[in-house]
Amino acid sequence: GADSCSLMIIGLAPGMHGANRSGVPFVGDSSGNLLSEVLKASGLAGRVKITNAVKCLPIKNLPSSREVKNCSRFLIREIEAHQLNTSPVLLLLGGVAHRATISALGGKQSDYRFAHGAVHDMDGVTLVDSYHCSRYNTQTGRLTYQMFLDVVTAAGNMAYP
C-alpha cells in the first residue's frame, strides 16, 4: 500500500493461502481479491495502506488473544507512522481487527462497540468498522459486495474529503 496516505485498512491476520504465501496482506486469496475489486471500484486502489492486526498465521484461522497481544506493538508502530502523515482514517475489517486496534490505541472496548458501518472518533483518529471480507462472510451473505463497497467508499470519503 501507499506509504503516505489518509486511509489505513487493518485486517485480521495473514490468510493461509494469501498473505502467508505472498508475504503481502490481502494478496493471493478470495479476501484479497474482493478487497482489490472494491478498492478499484471506489477509486481507492493505490491510495491506502493495508496491514493486519496479527502478523503470524493463526493456528485455527482465528488469532488467540495472546497472538493479538503479542502483535499489538507492531500495530501501534504502524498506526503511529500512519498518523505522522495524515489525519488518519482506519478501516477495521472484522471484530478482531476492531478490538485489536481499540486496545492498541489504549481505548476501552465498551466505548467503541463493533458494528458494520459504525464510525468512531478516538482522539482524532476516525475508526470505521466493516465485517471482514472473508469467503465465509461473503458466502453466508453476512457481507455482500455492495455492503463492502459502501463502507469502503464511505471510509475513502472521510479520508479524502
Please name every model-derived segment.
Residues 1-114, 118-160:
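A polyanion-binding, active-site-adjacent surface
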